[in-house]
Amino acid sequence: MVFARKRFGQNFLHDRSVIAHIIEAINPKPGDPIVEIGPGRGALTEDLLQAAGELDAIEIDRDLAADLQQRFGDRGLHLHVTDALRFDFAALAETKGRRLRIIGNLPYNISTPLLFHLLKTPAAILDLHIMLQREVIERICAEAGSSEYGRLTVMLAPWVEAEHLFDVGPGAFRPAPEVWSAVARLTVRQEPAFA
């Protein structure tokens, strides 16, 4: 068994009802060009593979990657053992011939830089379904004038239409984080929208 590593900010999702809720929100279809960032122990991976038929996954932890490859390598998993902050999403979208659907229970310690890395090439990304610390999701999805509205909201709003889908308690993870999480859908605009 592979244990969570603090340096990678790992908390593994294990709650089947939360997993089902996330899969329902994503609504993956056969042939969707799905990329899972940080699949960890594969909590979402199996259901995503079953729905889409194939899946690209980016995992930085070599031990987890080896386990994922052993379990899903012959079932349509295309594993990239690398740092998502250095991954070329535009090249993958070009190879697939379609805009990517990004899924991720993102490590909280790299979430903001990763979002900006993804949005450097908005034409490559269709949407993102992400789980982050609840306070970060609230800031991403904030309405102008609310107490959560701030720099992150302003920087992302031109590029995404953000929707806070649902909250996830600490008990859904092992080890349990000290904070609540939330899932959001970010629909990416190919051109920025300015108010």
Model-derived segments and spans:
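Catalytic cores of RNA-modifying enzymes
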Residues: M1-A195
